Amino acid sequence: MKMNLMKMMMNNDNNNKLLNKVMMINNNNNNKLSNKVNTKQLNNNNQWSMMMYNYNKNNELNNIMNNNMMIQLLYKMMNMVNGNKMFISKPQFKININSVVIKFYYYNMNNNNNHNEINNMMMRLSKVLSYYYNKEVMIKPIKMSYVYMDSNIFTDYIMYLLTNNNNMNMDKIMNSYMNMFSNIMPLNINNQDKNVKYLSGWSIMLKGKLSDGRSKMTKMMYGSFNNNNKNYDLNNMPNNMYKGSVNPLNLNINKDGKYNIKVKLNYNK
């Protein structure tokens, strides 16, 4: 399927067919949104950021539908490059009268140097999308060197590790990042360059229902999210602080129930 999708994106005659297919898949959802809620509610419930410089309600609704199509295309296309596992942030849309700028961050788990290939693919996609937005479209992918520099990317990364590695669990993941935390934090915060951005804390919440129907929540805070740990001293952290009743190792709903992971990251400059 990935090869077929790539061939369609490389063939200009088939580009519109691909986008039409995505539009048809989301058509029912978009119709429900347009009929049941107003554009202000839509903008608050979307999974992306959108900055518009026109106030036509019909245009706003059309842009939201186009953005919904675009965000799904990005997730699919970023993992079409051979030998890559990509995690992307929530795209940011800046819609002007004559142009649309789409910016997003991505993290490559395989650390392959294929930034040029991704840029070329985004340029081809921009040309196709310009027909749907009826204006110039520019897509700006920005590579991130560290997975913990965006909360959405970090969340998807944790979920991927838990669901694809039988030897991985939350204890191992969090302990590995706790050990790295002293290296992430500057030795002397007051003497650091103000332009340097560093991770100062995280909050990770696992929330869901067990197989017996009981609700459970486990919350893990460290660094600036923990008022009792202002000095970021790793020696004061108990070894079992990340163990909870929700076990994400074996993804058997009947046995273990369902759960969600929510990550918040805090940075200092």
Swiss-Prot record:
Entry keyword set: Mitochondrion, Ribonucleoprotein, Ribosomal protein
Source organism superkingdom: Eukaryota
Keyword Mitochondrion: yes
GO MF entries: structural constituent of ribosome
Pfam annotation, one family: VAR1
Locations listed in the record: Mitochondrion
GO biological process: translation
Transferase recorded as keyword: no
Chief location category: mitochondrion
InterPro entries in alphabetical order: Ribosomal_uS3m_fun
Any single GO CC term annotated in Swiss-Prot or TrEMBL for this entry: ribosome
Biological function: Essential for mitochondrial protein synthesis and required for the maturation of small ribosomal subunits.
Family: Belongs to the universal ribosomal protein uS3 family.
Record protein name field: Small ribosomal subunit protein uS3m
